[in-house]
């Protein structure tokens, strides 16, 4: 039995998933005329990398048509401006001779015609911008650094707007969704607040018989219980998951340290709260009913009720009214009563 100090680990497990994943679908249609050789499942891509290109001829024609229409509208606007100036000058000459107090109508000054010409110019500018945008969309680029999960595009294929031809997931981070009981979630400091710093965590996965770890932190928690399991999903974020993991043992293993693979089932250890008074004991010492059989230097058994804070694979973290010098019985007894005298050996107590 060891008096605890520091943070109690919170253990869980979940499946590794990417922090972001999207379908790749063209926004315009046409025949595919070029495909990046790197646009294949499993390959890494960078933000802005062109994945494939759609034939541009039709879209360039639309741009030229829009440019020509815009040029016509610019000439029409100049003509409308000149007509308006002439109409105003003629009216001023007429009014100065025949009707000095008169007010000219907008139609007389050709103001509606001028506004119509200005609106037509704006409309053609918008059409040109739309044509250029459609042309730019013939080049389909990766929106972020990531990996190709799947692709289904080939040279000569007819691409349809909105129809997915591939899927990418982000390379900057991965997430592990860890379902925890409310008792375990309560051990994570600041889970429901934005105060304080990041809560450290580690994702641990097996690869070729060797266990590897990747550093991470608690990113957030779902605000609703899973209706089936009644657990809280805590999301642990692992930055740079595709870097080599840290081996937790030095004995022989496969050549090269692996990344944290998407879809891998991983264990997670989260740095929990640090209570002021708790004990770490072997899991074998915990008896049914959350009791520990403790024996003092006098060889007398005391049955101590405990509150279990956390259970690990080989140890449990508990609080209870233990006395100085007591050890926990981990074997050698089928039953015990309070006050029973026993003889202890090193392998039977801890």
Feature locations, PLM:
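Beta-strand/loop subdomains of soluble extracytoplasmic proteins
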Residues: 9, 173, 180-233, 287-291
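Structural motif
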Residues: 43, 49, 125, 157, ...
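Edge-of-domain interaction segments
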Residues: 248-303, 307-350
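Structural microfeature recognizing short secondary-structure transition sites
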Residues: 208-276, 286
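Surface-exposed patches in structured soluble domains
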Residues: 15, 44-47, 134, 141-187, ...
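Short beta-strand-turn/beta-hairpin segments enriched in glycine/proline and small hydrophobics
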Residues: 8-36, 126-143, 168-170, 176, ...
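Extended amphipathic alpha-helical segments
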Residues: 8-11, 68, 72-76, 80-82, ...
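Long, amphipathic coiled-coil "stalk"/hairpin helices in large membrane-associated assemblies
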Residues: 7-69, 143, 147-155, 161-163, ...
């Amino acid at each position: 039995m060891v008096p605890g100090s520091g943070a109690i680990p919170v253990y869980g497990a979940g499946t590794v998933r990417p922090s972001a994943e999207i379908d790749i679908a063209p926004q315009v249609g046409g025949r595919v005329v070029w495909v990046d050789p790197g646009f294949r499942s499993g390959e890494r891509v960078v933000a802005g990398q062109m994945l494939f290109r759609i034939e541009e001829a039709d879209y360039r024609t639309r741009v030229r048509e829009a440019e020509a229409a815009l040029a016509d509208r610019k000439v029409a606007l100049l003509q409308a401006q000149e007509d308006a100036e002439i109409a105003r000058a003629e009216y001023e000459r007429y009014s100065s001779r025949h009707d000095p107090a008169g007010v000219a109508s907008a139609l007389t000054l050709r103001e509606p015609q001028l506004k119509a010409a200005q609106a037509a110019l704006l409309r053609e500018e918008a059409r040109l911008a739309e044509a250029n945008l459609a042309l730019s969309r013939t080049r389909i680029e990766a929106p972020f650094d990531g990996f190709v999960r799947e692709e289904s595009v080939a040279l000569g294929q007819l691409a349809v707007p909105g129809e997915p031809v591939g899927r990418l997931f982000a390379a900057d981070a991965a997430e592990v969704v860890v379902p925890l009981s409310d008792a375990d979630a309560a051990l994570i400091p600041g889970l429901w607040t934005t105060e304080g710093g990041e809560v450290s965590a580690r994702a641990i996965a097996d690869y070729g018989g060797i266990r590897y770890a990747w550093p991470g932190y608690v990113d957030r928690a779902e605000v609703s219980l899973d209706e089936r399991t009644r657990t809280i999903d805590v999301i642990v974020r692992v930055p740079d998951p595709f870097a080599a993991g840290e081996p937790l043992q030095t004995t022989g293993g496969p050549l090269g340290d692996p990344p944290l693979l998407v879809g891998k089932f991983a264990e997670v250890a989260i740095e929990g709260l640090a209570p002021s008074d708790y004990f770490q004991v072997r899991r074998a010492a915990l008896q049914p009913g959350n009791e520990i059989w403790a024996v003092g230097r006098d060889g007398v058994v005391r049955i101590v009720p405990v509150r279990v804070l956390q259970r690990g694979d080989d140890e449990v973290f508990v609080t209870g009214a233990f006395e100085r010098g007591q050890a926990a019985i981990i074997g050698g007894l089928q039953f015990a009563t309070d006050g029973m005298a026993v003889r202890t050996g090193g392998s039977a107590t801890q």
